[in-house]
């Protein structure tokens, strides 16, 4: 690539370390956040390199999502900068459609990531004023690289690593199948089987719905309170309605209106084992980042008894689970819909922008920029819209510096050229 230059290394096969200077920022992660940042940098005329540990873009969507998943929000709030979704796409694009959109996006902006490059560490070198990013190849070569650059964009996202809870007996005694929701594809293989879904977020609800649709005997563990909202209210998405209301009313009133509308549409959910938090859905989202569940059909299955809500787990044994209320359920499989976490602390050697939980210390919209050329894209807890906002800000910030320095370089070149002519 024209913006990468090999600095040192050996042709000897015993020396697998290569050092590469990147003339522009390095973006870690080729998901939607990384692609959006790359596209905006391309528009700014700034060269870049994208490092991706998988062998494809958007690996979370391509390899770690179930077949039936769709975008939970309308496409117009999920599109990336500079390129809308195709007009013939539905309001809530499918998994396949979203992947095709991202592939078209990468092609349009000529984004060609360095695949199978797993970042082991990234640190800022105070002496040189540059970032040093060490990677290993996940391919058979096992080669090692060190990328050196002035700017580093962390775009590995909020969902880089799965969260697997420690539950008594789950891995030591239970003999049935145990998978994380990132490994779940379809309920077809569980037809007629008893499956426990651990977790009641959007993934847990959707997996439970899919299991019920495939005639599995589905139970879902709900340990804590949860906000469930209809995905649409009077033909408009709950998200759009909440954003509109927040322009005119205080947050507490917006939450009150949303909860009244949810009660009118979904009814009283407490009798089904779903208690609401004391804090309203939008306030809770802003304060903690916890997203309300948008119902796409799971509540109907819960009300009909096709999906059973159960309390917390006490322990697992060979073929069943004992719950905290004394119930015992015979099980064939367990799906852990227990979410994901950021993996930034495992490789980024920095403590200014990011906190120990792998998220920026500052809240949105001020979480995209750190010191020494460090940036964060897609850690806003605001979904794709937040990632797009980060991408635009990052590209403009780097672009301003890039253009100014390019202008100065041209001026120095002109001055030097004139001196040469006068001497001649």
Curated annotation (Swiss-Prot):
EC number(s) on file: 1.14.13.168
Residues annotated for NADP(+) binding in this entry: 199-204
Recorded catalytic activity of this chain's protein: indole-3-pyruvate + NADPH + O2 + H(+) = (indol-3-yl)acetate + CO2 + NADP(+) + H2O
Name of the featured protein: Probable indole-3-pyruvate monooxygenase YUCCA5
Residue ranges crossing the lipid bilayer per the database entry: none
Swiss-Prot/TrEMBL cofactor(s): FAD
Biological process annotations from GO: auxin biosynthetic process; response to ethylene
Keywords for this protein: Auxin biosynthesis, FAD, Flavoprotein, Monooxygenase, NADP, Oxidoreductase
Positions annotated to bind FAD: 29-34
A single GO molecular function term of this UniProt record: NADP binding
Recorded name of the encoding gene: YUC5
EC class: oxidoreductase
Family to which the UniProt record says this protein belongs: Belongs to the FMO family.
Gene source species: Arabidopsis thaliana
Source species, domain of life: Eukaryota
Protein's UniProt keywords contain Oxidoreductase: yes
Known pathway: Plant hormone metabolism; auxin biosynthesis
Function: Involved in auxin biosynthesis. Belongs to the set of redundant YUCCA genes probably responsible for auxin biosynthesis in roots.
Bridged cysteine pairs (disulfide): none
Pfam families: FMO-like
Tissue specificity annotation: Predominantly expressed in roots and young vegetative tissues, while it was under detectable levels in reproductive tissues, such as inflorescence stems, pedicels, and floral buds.
